[in-house]
From Swiss-Prot:
Keywords per UniProt: Coiled coil, DNA-binding, Transcription, Transcription regulation
UniProt protein name: Transcription elongation factor GreA
PROSITE patterns associated with the record: GREAB_1
Keyword field contains Magnesium: no
Function: Necessary for efficient RNA polymerase transcription elongation past template-encoded arresting sites. The arresting sites in DNA have the property of trapping a certain fraction of elongating RNA polymerases that pass through, resulting in locked ternary complexes. Cleavage of the nascent transcript by cleavage factors such as GreA or GreB allows the resumption of elongation from the new 3'terminus. GreA releases sequences of 2 to 3 nucleotides.
Any coiled-coil regions, as ranges: 1-84
Pfam families cross-referenced by the UniProt entry: GreA_GreB, GreA_GreB_N
SUPFAM superfamilies listed in its UniProt record: FKBP-like (SSF54534), GreA transcript cleavage protein, N-terminal domain (SSF46557)
Amino acid sequence: MAKYTISKHRLEELQLELREILDVKWPAITKQLQDAREQGDLSENADYDAAKNEQAALKKRKDEIEEILENYELIEDVLRSTDEVSIGSTIEIYNYQKDCEEVITLVGSMDSDPFANKISIDTPLGKALVKQKKGTEVTVHTLASPYKVKIIKIID
Protein backbone atom coordinates (compact mmCIF):
# COMPACT_ATOMS: atom_id res chain seq x y z
CA MET A 1 0.00 0.00 0.00
CA ALA A 2 1.20 3.51 -0.84
CA LYS A 3 2.46 5.64 2.02
CA TYR A 4 1.73 8.97 0.32
CA THR A 5 -1.41 10.14 -1.43
CA ILE A 6 -0.74 13.06 -3.76
CA SER A 7 -2.34 14.89 -6.63
CA LYS A 8 -1.01 14.69 -10.17
CA HIS A 9 -0.01 18.36 -9.95
CA ARG A 10 2.02 17.78 -6.76
CA LEU A 11 3.61 14.67 -8.31
CA GLU A 12 4.78 16.73 -11.28
CA GLU A 13 6.18 19.41 -8.94
CA LEU A 14 8.17 16.79 -7.04
CA GLN A 15 9.50 15.25 -10.26
CA LEU A 16 10.63 18.69 -11.46
CA GLU A 17 12.24 19.47 -8.10
CA LEU A 18 14.16 16.18 -8.21
CA ARG A 19 15.34 16.89 -11.78
CA GLU A 20 16.56 20.33 -10.69
CA ILE A 21 18.45 18.84 -7.75
CA LEU A 22 20.10 16.17 -9.90
CA ASP A 23 20.78 18.25 -13.01
CA VAL A 24 21.48 21.73 -11.62
CA LYS A 25 21.99 21.99 -7.88
CA TRP A 26 24.06 18.83 -7.32
CA PRO A 27 26.62 19.63 -10.05
CA ALA A 28 26.85 23.22 -8.75
CA ILE A 29 27.52 22.13 -5.17
CA THR A 30 30.06 19.56 -6.40
CA LYS A 31 31.88 22.39 -8.20
CA GLN A 32 31.78 24.55 -5.05
CA LEU A 33 33.31 21.71 -3.04
CA GLN A 34 36.01 21.19 -5.65
CA ASP A 35 36.84 24.92 -5.68
CA ALA A 36 36.95 24.99 -1.86
CA ARG A 37 39.30 21.97 -1.77
CA GLU A 38 41.66 23.77 -4.13
CA GLN A 39 41.98 26.59 -1.58
CA GLY A 40 44.09 24.29 0.56
CA ASP A 41 43.61 23.59 4.27
CA LEU A 42 40.03 22.40 4.82
CA SER A 43 40.11 22.62 8.62
CA GLU A 44 39.36 26.36 8.61
CA ASN A 45 37.73 26.71 5.21
CA ALA A 46 34.31 28.37 5.61
CA ASP A 47 33.45 27.91 1.92
CA TYR A 48 34.06 24.17 2.20
CA ASP A 49 31.98 23.88 5.39
CA ALA A 50 29.11 25.84 3.85
CA ALA A 51 29.19 23.72 0.69
CA LYS A 52 29.24 20.47 2.73
CA ASN A 53 26.22 21.67 4.73
CA GLU A 54 24.36 22.59 1.56
CA GLN A 55 25.26 19.23 0.01
CA ALA A 56 23.88 17.41 3.08
CA ALA A 57 20.63 19.39 2.91
CA LEU A 58 20.31 18.67 -0.83
CA LYS A 59 20.92 14.96 -0.28
CA LYS A 60 18.29 14.87 2.46
CA ARG A 61 15.71 16.56 0.21
CA LYS A 62 16.62 14.29 -2.73
CA ASP A 63 16.15 11.22 -0.53
CA GLU A 64 12.78 12.53 0.73
CA ILE A 65 11.51 13.11 -2.80
CA GLU A 66 12.74 9.70 -3.98
CA GLU A 67 10.96 8.04 -1.03
CA ILE A 68 7.71 9.78 -1.98
CA LEU A 69 8.10 8.91 -5.67
CA GLU A 70 8.63 5.24 -4.82
CA ASN A 71 5.60 5.03 -2.49
CA TYR A 72 2.74 7.17 -3.77
CA GLU A 73 -0.82 6.80 -4.94
CA LEU A 74 -2.44 9.43 -7.11
CA ILE A 75 -5.58 10.93 -5.62
CA GLU A 76 -7.19 10.79 -9.07
CA ASP A 77 -6.81 6.99 -8.95
CA VAL A 78 -8.87 6.72 -5.77
CA LEU A 79 -12.54 6.06 -6.46
CA ARG A 80 -14.80 8.82 -5.17
CA SER A 81 -18.51 9.20 -4.80
CA THR A 82 -20.86 11.86 -3.50
CA ASP A 83 -22.41 9.28 -1.15
CA GLU A 84 -19.50 9.12 1.27
CA VAL A 85 -16.49 11.28 2.09
CA SER A 86 -13.16 10.14 0.65
CA ILE A 87 -9.84 11.63 -0.34
CA GLY A 88 -10.43 14.33 -2.92
CA SER A 89 -13.95 15.06 -1.66
CA THR A 90 -15.01 18.66 -1.26
CA ILE A 91 -17.48 18.87 1.58
CA GLU A 92 -19.46 21.45 3.47
CA ILE A 93 -19.36 20.94 7.22
CA TYR A 94 -20.80 22.69 10.23
CA ASN A 95 -18.21 23.16 12.97
CA TYR A 96 -20.04 23.32 16.31
CA GLN A 97 -16.97 24.61 18.13
CA LYS A 98 -16.55 27.58 15.77
CA ASP A 99 -20.32 27.91 15.20
CA CYS A 100 -19.86 28.23 11.45
CA GLU A 101 -20.06 26.39 8.16
CA GLU A 102 -16.87 25.60 6.26
CA VAL A 103 -16.12 24.15 2.85
CA ILE A 104 -13.04 21.93 2.88
CA THR A 105 -11.36 19.50 0.52
CA LEU A 106 -9.77 16.33 1.86
CA VAL A 107 -6.37 15.79 0.29
CA GLY A 108 -3.30 13.64 0.72
CA SER A 109 -0.67 14.69 3.22
CA MET A 110 1.59 16.06 0.48
CA ASP A 111 -1.14 18.41 -0.80
CA SER A 112 -2.45 19.84 2.46
CA ASP A 113 -2.81 23.61 2.74
CA PRO A 114 -4.97 24.65 5.70
CA PHE A 115 -5.04 28.27 4.50
CA ALA A 116 -6.74 27.09 1.29
CA ASN A 117 -9.03 24.71 3.24
CA LYS A 118 -7.20 21.67 1.86
CA ILE A 119 -7.16 19.32 4.83
CA SER A 120 -5.01 16.19 4.97
CA ILE A 121 -6.77 12.89 5.51
CA ASP A 122 -4.07 12.21 8.10
CA THR A 123 -5.28 15.03 10.40
CA PRO A 124 -7.78 14.38 13.18
CA LEU A 125 -10.49 16.16 11.14
CA GLY A 126 -9.65 14.20 7.99
CA LYS A 127 -9.64 10.88 9.83
CA ALA A 128 -13.00 11.66 11.44
CA LEU A 129 -14.65 12.54 8.11
CA VAL A 130 -13.40 9.74 5.85
CA LYS A 131 -16.09 7.19 4.90
CA GLN A 132 -18.86 9.23 6.54
CA LYS A 133 -22.11 10.22 4.85
CA LYS A 134 -24.09 13.45 4.48
CA GLY A 135 -25.90 14.37 7.70
CA THR A 136 -23.48 12.49 9.95
CA GLU A 137 -22.12 14.16 13.07
CA VAL A 138 -18.60 13.13 13.98
CA THR A 139 -16.32 13.85 16.90
CA VAL A 140 -12.87 15.10 16.01
CA HIS A 141 -10.32 13.97 18.59
CA THR A 142 -7.48 16.44 19.05
CA LEU A 143 -4.83 16.80 21.73
CA ALA A 144 -6.41 20.02 22.99
CA SER A 145 -10.02 18.88 23.19
CA PRO A 146 -12.48 16.95 21.06
CA TYR A 147 -15.07 18.84 19.02
CA LYS A 148 -18.00 17.95 16.77
CA VAL A 149 -18.70 18.66 13.14
CA LYS A 150 -21.66 17.75 10.94
CA ILE A 151 -21.40 16.88 7.26
CA ILE A 152 -23.91 19.15 5.54
CA LYS A 153 -23.12 18.30 1.93
CA ILE A 154 -20.66 16.26 -0.10
CA ILE A 155 -20.09 18.58 -3.05
CA ASP A 156 -17.90 16.26 -5.12
